[in-house]
């Protein structure tokens, strides 16, 4: 039984806790593993036990995982009350663009710097980036950093008020499309078919922007875990987190297959 199944916080003792400076902005990053670098960004409401479980799976598959603290209490079990407060703070933060018309979240510039540092430390052909929920689209924006060659966009929820929108400014959208076309990057993405926060309209918008470079995979909502932590049960209220809170850790399960596909994608891009 892991921490989330027991309703406990995760102490994160198997990761080194670093203070990482990018252009004078310092954030906490949890690092563990050996091999090519993968930046795994948290979903709302923070670096939960489920996010850390995914990070450990990636680490154990032969990667160095970097988990930046962007919001919430690190390692905390996601309760409804605390999670709602984290969302409220993030929605008005200068680092994020949660609503339509806001363009690209400024924090992605810092994340690109983290990817550069990870590549410098780990070497290899490049770095992977996994975004989840609130940070889902950040993995795509990070391809503006040349070292990022394996973006995974999981259930991207921004902008919150436009189901067909993308959390990207026009100039960045053009630059991302050009980078993807120029370097032959495939963008891997996942959602549940009945997710209200990441709809088919959003995946259609990605397809319009990226064409065949967008590999959007859709799982049946009925495959989602039925007893997720309180934040997901009471606030999210829909199948959403394919590889974290709504993952079912059983052999052959569609969500576990999605996890395996992500790891295989990272291995194909980063271990070559």
What are these regions (language model features)?
Residues 1-272:
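N-terminal cap/leader regions of alpha/beta-hydrolase-fold enzymes
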């Amino acid at each position: 039984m892991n921490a989330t199944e027991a309703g406990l916080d995760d102490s994160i003792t198997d990761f080194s806790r670093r203070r990482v400076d990018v252009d004078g902005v310092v954030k906490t990053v949890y690092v563990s593993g050996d091999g090519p670098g993968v930046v795994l960004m948290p979903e709302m409401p923070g670096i939960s036990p489920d996010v850390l479980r995914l990070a450990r799976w990636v680490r154990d598959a032969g990667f160095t995982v970097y988990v930046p603290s962007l919001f919430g209490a690190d390692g905390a079990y996601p309760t409804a009350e605390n999670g709602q407060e984290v969302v409220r703070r993030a929605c008005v933060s200068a680092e994020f663009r949660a609503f339509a018309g806001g363009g690209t979240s400024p924090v992605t510039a810092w994340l690109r710097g983290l990817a550069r540092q990870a590549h410098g430390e780990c070497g290899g052909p490049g770095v992977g980036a996994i975004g989840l929920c609130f940070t889902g689209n950040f993995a795509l924006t990070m391809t503006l950093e040349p070292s990022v060659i394996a973006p995974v966009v999981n259930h991207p929820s921004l902008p919150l008020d436009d189901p067909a929108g993308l959390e990207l400014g026009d100039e960045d959208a053009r630059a991302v499309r050009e980078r993807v076309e120029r370097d032959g990057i495939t963008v891997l993405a996942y959602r549940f078919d009945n997710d209200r926060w990441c709809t088919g309209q959003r995946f259609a918008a990605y397809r319009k922007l990226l064409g065949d470079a967008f590999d959007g995979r859709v799982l049946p909502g009925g495959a989602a875990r039925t007893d997720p932590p309180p934040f997901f049960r009471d606030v999210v209220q829909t199948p959403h987190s394919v590889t974290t809170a709504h993952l079912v850790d059983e052999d052959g399960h569609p969500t576990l297959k999605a996890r395996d596909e992500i790891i295989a994608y990272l291995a194909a891009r980063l271990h070559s």
